[in-house]
Regions:
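Extended hydrophobic/Leu-rich segments
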Residues: 94, 204-206, 358
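Serine endopeptidase catalytic core focused on the charge-relay Asp
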Residues: 117, 129-144, 148-151, 155-309, ...
Length: 359
């Protein structure tokens, strides 16, 4: 088998091991046709077509669900988990049908999300705790930059403090390597839009007045915001590792953008070819792993939420506790994604004096 195809198949098997599933299971099944109507059960996935209509608070799932998971796709799924030989067609089904179901992406609209299917039901139960977090996450937007307008995700973590990735800040901040005072590039300004939702042109932009600091160890940068709207509160950071660090339900909240270096099939199917809009991207935590970061090796959180480049700086939430446990910064397709552990920042000089709460 082609090495890339093997990695896709191995990734699907690993996701299902983490989810505790077997060949007879398929996630996010919201309806089933009785087996007597065919040799294989058929599964239906909820439709998430982009629409300009608003989603009411605590919206119920759409009445119609598309697309149907075909018997061929279900058979591919079973073959994968049984470690059977896969054909080229099987690999296409894994990438275009099964992976979007295993680690889906959900729209955030009107600062909430629709009722989610059973595999993600804990997100429904934690809605009241998660909605304030949604409001504190935004899309970084530049004015006056010669090459970039949208550059990543950030979130509010202190009364006047925005956190994102250092590699994001490198695009529009000077002085990072020299040790001099940090400033925006000449003629460039930065704002954070805390809406930018699917199907809406509404925005709530916070002017970020200056870059403050970057971490020497972690892919973290701090920006200044002078005022917050009343409905946006700073997010406390977890001051210790969650009990669910290995296998716990998690979600990224951020703004995935199109990545020309990634599979178009994956992006079209998992993200529905909708980019740079606020999304809920659930998955599971997978412990700690050593990865390179700015000339060092760091022990990052591993997670398997579906992400793209615009997710740099996204908040990583433990769904069980509704706490910020990490800041997403990189990943390897069909292998793992990585986040800065929030508790490792307790004594980081970049955050000193910023009135950040660690729980």
């Amino acid at each position: 088998m082609d090495p890339k195809h093997k990695r896709v198949a191995d990734f699907v098997r690993e996701l299902n091991r983490r989810d505790g599933r077997g060949p007879g299971d398929f996630p996010i099944a919201v309806s089933r046709v009785e087996p007597r109507r065919g040799n294989l059960e058929r599964f239906v996935l909820p439709s998430q077509q982009e629409t300009s209509s608003s989603v009411p608070k605590h919206a119920e799932p759409a009445a119609e669900h598309t697309p149907t998971i075909t018997p061929e796709a279900a058979e591919t799924f079973a073959k994968t988990l049984d470690n059977q030989q896969l054909s080229a067609d099987d690999i296409v089904r894994l990438e275009s049908i099964i992976l979007p179901a295993l680690r889906p992406v959900f729209d955030i609209q009107n600062e909430t999300y629709a009722q989610l299917p059973g595999d993600w039901d804990l997100l429904n139960h934690q809605r009241a705790a998660l909605e304030p977090i949604l409001r504190a996450v935004g899309r970084l937007q530049l004015t006056g930059h010669p090459s970039y307008t949208l550059v990543g995700t950030a979130f509010v973590c202190g009364p006047n403090t925005i956190v994102t990735n250092r590699h994001v800040a490198q695009i529009f901040v000077q002085g990072l390597e020299s040790g001099q005072q940090l400033t925006y590039l000449p003629g460039v300004s930065c704002a954070m839009d805390t809406l930018a939702e699917v199907g809406s042109d509404a925005s709530v932009k916070l002017d970020l007045t200056r870059p403050v600091s970057v971490s020497d160890t972690w892919d973290v940068a701090i920006l200044q915001v002078d005022a917050l709207p009343p409905n946006i509160q700073p997010l406390p950071l977890a001051g210790s590792a969650p009990a669910s660090l290995q296998g716990g339900l998690a979600t990224i909240i951020g703004y995935p953008s199109y990545d020309p270096n990634e599979s178009f099939v994956d992006q079209a199917n998992v993200f529905r070819a909708v980019f740079d809009k606020k999304r809920l991207q659930p998955g599971r935590l997978n412990g700690r792993v050593d990865v390179p970061s700015f000339g060092r090796t760091v022990s990052a959180i591993a997670h398997d939420c579906s992400t793209l480049g615009g997710n740099s700086g996204s908040v990583l939430i433990s769904v069980e506790t509704a706490q910020v446990v990490g800041i997403h910064f990189s990943g390897t397709t069909h292998l793992s994604n990585y986040a800065v552990p929030s508790w490792e920042l307790v004594n980081d000089a970049a955050l000193a004096g910023r009135d950040i709460t660690f729980n």
